[in-house]
Design a protein with these regions (language model features):
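Short, basic/hydrophobic alpha-helical segments
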Residues: 68-88
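Charged, gly/pro-enriched flexible loop segments at helix/strand junctions
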Residues: 172-178
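Mobile genetic element proteins and their domesticated derivatives, centered on retroelements
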Residues: 7-9, 49, 55, 74, ...
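Extended, low-complexity cationic-aromatic segments
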Residues: 1-75
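RNase H-like two-metal-ion nuclease catalytic core shared by retroviral integrases
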Residues: 44, 92, 119-146, 158
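Active-site proximal helix-loop segment of RNase H-like, two-metal nucleases, encompassing DDE(D)
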Residues: 57, 137-156, 170-172
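RNase H-like polynucleotidyl transferase catalytic core
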Residues: 33-38, 109-136, 152-154
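Acidic/histidine-rich, metal-coordinating catalytic segments
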Residues: 85-98, 127
């Protein structure tokens, strides 16, 4: 009743690749082309939480994907969602999700929230090993890759992040559940 289900994961190794020359467009009897040569400008990790109910995306980017960045992300979720709700996080079995510092913060957060609202704040639900396909946020990552990242040419990490933010801002205008 007072719960929000969020399908969470991180997309690591989002590469800022700058193509060395533009591809040729589609034409009669010609498929679209693209060069395989590129300049690599670095990578980022995109942390995302997809609301199971309405398709809204909570997100944050980071240079790495350790337990520290994961903890920053779930703290971000805690601040971005209404107090009084229990957040049910659907996540995979990646070690960063089970790190002692993450568990310690979750325990503290749940104790504090329980005192104020009578319910835990965050409950982790782990998908079975090798079953990441069960987590709906993976479908979102596929769409992001196909629609925004794969064919893009990015001159910097900032350019890649701006492109992802533009894509997500447009998507947020009419979010949809999967």
């Amino acid at each position: 009743d007072r719960s929000l289900v969020l399908c969470c994961d991180e997309k690591s190794q989002c590469q800022a690749l700058e193509r060395t020359q533009p591809g040729l467009p589609l034409g009669p009897h010609r498929v679209r082309t693209g060069t395989h040569d590129y300049i690599r400008h670095g990578t980022i990790t995109l942390f995302a939480a997809l609301s199971y109910l309405d398709g809204k995306i909570f997100r944050q980017t980071a240079e790495r994907h350790t337990h520290t960045e994961w903890l920053d992300f779930i703290k971000h979720l805690e601040k971005q969602t209404p107090a009084g709700l229990t957040l049910h996080l659907i996540i995979d079995n990646y070690a960063t999700h089970k790190h002692p510092k993450v568990k310690s913060w979750l325990k503290w957060c749940n104790q504090r929230h329980h005192k104020q609202h009578g319910v835990d704040r965050m409950v982790m639900h782990f998908t079975p090993t090798s079953s990441s396909w069960m987590n709906l946020v993976e479908r979102f990552f596929r769409d992001l890759t196909v629609d925004c990242v794969r064919d893009g040419s990015f001159t910097s990490i900032d350019d890649l992040v701006a492109s992802i933010e533009t894509y997500l801002t447009e998507r947020d205008l009419a979010p949809k559940p999967y």
